[in-house]
């Protein structure tokens, strides 16, 4: 004689699979509930998302590190410029020496046609 099992044998399921099946049954029960009950909120309120308040302006203190870094950068730029100026001054002259008033007149002559056009 064979004994008939009183309960059907349960198959082992992982926690993830159990959570999925519970989620699926909850979705089925949740989709059936709103159809039977009228919604309490108007449709426009249901579709609105709550907007967070705008962030308050924050005053950040100036960093000493960045101030120092700017000073170091400025000094190194001045040093490089001084070296390049020294090289230019000791090299041969690229242009003949001119009076500053003549240079100014030439610049103004170049700008006049552009302004008139």
Swiss-Prot record:
It comes from the Eukaryota. GO terms for biological process: post-transcriptional regulation of gene expression; regulation of translation. Disruption phenotype: RNAi-mediated knockdown in the bloodstream form abolishes cell population growth. Keywords: Cytoplasm, Translation regulation. Transmembrane segments: none annotated. The keyword Cytoplasm applies. GO terms for cellular component: cytoplasm. Residues 32-44 have a biased composition (Low complexity). It is found in: Cytoplasm. Residues 1-60 are annotated as: Disordered. The keyword Transmembrane does not apply. Its main location: cytoplasm. Involved in post-transcriptional regulation of gene expression. Forms a complex composed of at least MKT1, PBP1, XAC1 and LSM12. Forms a complex composed of at least MKT1L, PBP1, XAC1 and LSM12. This is PBP1-interacting protein XAC1. It comes from Trypanosoma brucei brucei (strain 927/4 GUTat10.1). The gene is XAC1.
């Amino acid at each position: 004689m064979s004994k008939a099992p009183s309960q059907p044998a349960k198959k082992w399921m992982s926690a993830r699979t159990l959570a999925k099946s519970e989620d699926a049954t909850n979705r089925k029960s949740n989709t059936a509930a709103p159809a039977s009950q009228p919604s309490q909120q108007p449709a426009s309120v249901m579709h609105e998302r709550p907007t967070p308040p705008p962030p308050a302006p924050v005053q950040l203190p100036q960093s000493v590190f960045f101030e120092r870094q700017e000073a170091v950068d400025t000094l190194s730029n001045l040093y490089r410029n001084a070296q390049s100026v020294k090289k230019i001054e000791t090299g041969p002259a690229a242009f003949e020496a001119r009076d500053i008033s003549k240079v100014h007149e030439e610049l103004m002559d170049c700008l006049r046609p552009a302004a008139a056009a």
